[in-house]
């Protein structure tokens, strides 16, 4: 059984026991968070009706509330003018472990 959930501005495919990284959530380590479901597949049965999906939710436990993504380096360069600029960015993430799809 797996589900497509809306988490942190993105959609993620999850199963019970999976660990996922999503954009930073306002939750501390050990807390439980709940996500709305966009689709559920249980063997041959696919649930996409809004009325049925409203009854289903995905629960996840926060494993690491201070995770970070990879460092991304941005460079700008203007030819023949001596103008160059370097900048870096590192996205703040939250690591979650899926505990239940119910």
UniProtKB/Swiss-Prot annotation:
The lineage of its organism: Bacteria, Bacillati, Actinomycetota, Actinomycetes, Bifidobacteriales. PROSITE patterns: RIBOSOMAL_L21. GO terms for cellular component: cytoplasm; ribonucleoprotein complex; ribosome. Belongs to the bacterial ribosomal protein bL21 family. This protein binds to 23S rRNA in the presence of protein L20. Part of the 50S ribosomal subunit. Contacts protein L20. Keywords: Ribonucleoprotein, Ribosomal protein, RNA-binding, rRNA-binding. This is Large ribosomal subunit protein bL21. GO terms for biological process: translation. GO terms for molecular function: rRNA binding; structural constituent of ribosome.
